[in-house]
């Protein structure tokens, strides 16, 4: 007998109209011939509790959470992964046997994309621009994957110091906060430089982080979390200095692939998902 009831996944956020994750996940469901759907749902902050109840009521396999729900969702979850507990934010929820499990795949997606490019984090010095949600997840996962030291460059002293302190206290990596000054020089011993801010994201494609680009060397690997455009001015300028560069597309695809497997138990068709994402931004 044909089954007309699809398994449901989706994303809760506000705004969510420009979120491309559904296209990526739906391409994977189709490629694996799974009767799953991904719903892009606007959820206002005051309605988050009801929305989380609906995950259980509708028997959803899981959901993604985007701004402004990644931290506020925590009280509605039954359990957190070790990384999500350290980060203090969740972007993925998995429902199993009526319980909601929180995971953070932001940093994991970044680390997977980095390793796929041939890089390793073991004993490396990492410098991160920003101290927001993406920076936090990436910093924790870099530390958990063997980074020796992490520099946090941020304009807000409070946020920057808090993240550096978190890394020092909860992981085996050392960490330091550096106040983001104009034309900020990148520490010369940096192996991996990451822009974890939204500077340069469409439509502000001519913007780039205010750093001294002459301090980027060919020995560095330079990464951006921004996926639209893929080749940001930040990455183009770093490449002109001889640095290896990694776009934000890989992080987004790997993050979506992790979500897919967490929800379905099936290995993700990463190539299909990457093609679907690239088509969205052609």
Language-model features, listed with the residues they occupy:
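NAD(P)-binding Rossmann-fold cofactor-contacting core
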Residues: 145-170
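Rossmann-like adenosine-cofactor binding region
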Residues: 172-245
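Phosphate/diphosphate ligand-binding glycine-rich loop within oxidoreductases
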Residues: 2-117
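Adenosine-phosphate binding glycine-rich loop
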Residues: 221, 225-282
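Conserved beta-strand positions in the Rossmann-like core of class I SAM-dependent methyltransferases
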Residues: 39, 150-151, 246
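Glycine-rich adenosine-cofactor-binding loop
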Residues: 13, 104, 119, 123-144, ...
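Short helix-loop-beta connector
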Residues: 96, 119-125, 216-218
């Amino acid at each position: 007998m044909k089954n007309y009831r699809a398994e449901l996944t989706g994303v809760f956020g506000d705004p969510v109209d420009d979120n491309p994750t559904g296209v990526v996940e739906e391409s994977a469901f189709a490629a694996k011939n799974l009767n799953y759907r991904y719903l892009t749902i606007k959820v206002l902050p005051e309605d988050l509790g009801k929305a989380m109840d609906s995950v259980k009521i509708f028997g959803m396999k899981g959901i993604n959470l985007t701004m402004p729900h990644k931290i506020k969702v925590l009280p509605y979850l039954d359990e957190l992964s070790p990384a999500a507990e350290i980060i203090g934010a969740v972007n993925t929820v998995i429902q199993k046997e009526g319980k909601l499990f929180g995971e953070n795949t932001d940093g994991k997606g970044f680390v997977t994309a980095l390793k796929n490019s041939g890089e390793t984090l073991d004993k490396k010095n990492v410098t991160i621009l920003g101290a927001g949600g993406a920076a936090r997840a990436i910093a924790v996962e870099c530390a958990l994957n063997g980074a020796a030291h992490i520099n946090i460059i941020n304009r807000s002293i409070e946020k920057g110091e808090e993240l550096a302190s978190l890394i020092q206290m909860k992981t085996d990596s050392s960490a330091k906060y550096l106040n983001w000054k104009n034309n900020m020089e990148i520490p010369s011993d940096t192996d991996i430089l990451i822009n974890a801010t939204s500077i340069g994201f469409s439509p502000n494609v001519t913007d780039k982080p205010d750093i001294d680009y002459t301090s980027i060397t060919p020995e560095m690997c330079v990464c951006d979390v921004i996926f639209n455009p893929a080749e940001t001015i930040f990455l183009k300028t770093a490449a002109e200095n001889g640095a290896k560069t990694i776009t934000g597309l890989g992080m987004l695809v790997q993050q979506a692939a992790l979500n897919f497997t967490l929800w379905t138990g099936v290995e993700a068709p990463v190539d299909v998902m990457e093609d679907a994402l690239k088509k969205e931004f052609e």
